From Swiss-Prot:
Assigned keywords, A-Z: Calcium, Digestion, Disulfide bond, Hydrolase, Metal-binding, Protease, Secreted, Serine protease, Signal, Zymogen
Domain of life: Eukaryota
Protein name: Trypsin-2
Chain sites annotated for binding Ca(2+): 61, 63, 66, 71
Cellular location(s): Secreted, Extracellular space
A GO cellular component annotation in the UniProt record: extracellular space
Catalytic activity: Preferential cleavage: Arg-|-Xaa, Lys-|-Xaa
Comment on bound cofactor: Binds 1 Ca(2+) ion per subunit.
EC number: 3.4.21.4
InterPro entries: Peptidase_S1_PA, Peptidase_S1_PA_chymotrypsin, Peptidase_S1A, Serine_Proteases_S1, Trypsin_dom, TRYPSIN_HIS, TRYPSIN_SER
Residues flagged as site, Required for specificity: 179
The Peptidase S1 domain, residue ranges: 10-229
Amino acid sequence: AAFATEDDKIVGGYECKAYSQPHQVSLNSGYHFCGGSLVNENWVVSAAHCYQSRVEVRLGEHNIQVTEGSEQFISSSRVIRHPNYSSYNIDNDIMLIKLSKPATLNTYVQPVALPTSCAPAGTMCTVSGWGNTMSSTADKNKLQCLNIPILSYSDCNNSYPGMITNAMFCAGYLEGGKDSCQGDSGGPVVCNGELQGVVSWGYGCAEPGNPGVYAKVCIFNDWLTSTMATY
């Protein structure tokens, strides 16, 4: 199966209710290449493997091919990968993007809270993105959503022996058929109103025994808050 790291697709999901994920952003460099999450008016969290030195952040989007009047396009002023990010095993796959000017918060653009604690296995979460849906009927230009449970460390480690660090968690369905995939990378996993995950990697898309792997945001709270306070 393909090693899906470059970008990641919602498979087996549904079109999100428009603007129901107002923290969701699209990272654009002439085209949509990754997702991200607005965490306050100045900062976006994404995946380190989505790194580009300059990026346009598109907020308030639902259909990324159509101008709907709700959008804000703001360029980055700095892009900061986690200092311990490893492209070899995709460890610490998290980064911060500072906006060149504050986002205007409104119905369409709202931050998501950073986690107050790590969500336990079994917690239901929503992952969203504009990736490839692998479906002829779903419109990938419209934001896709999927509800997935956080899996236990043992289920995660059994799926990917020796590859799961304490900076990762698995979520989804071991039987396959529903997953995040190419084009969703860097995007949000939101559980009970908190950003618990960033779409990171996996084998293939929605394949049995290969759930999605996500950066574990709760262990990065100190780095996120101190970095945002510094810059």
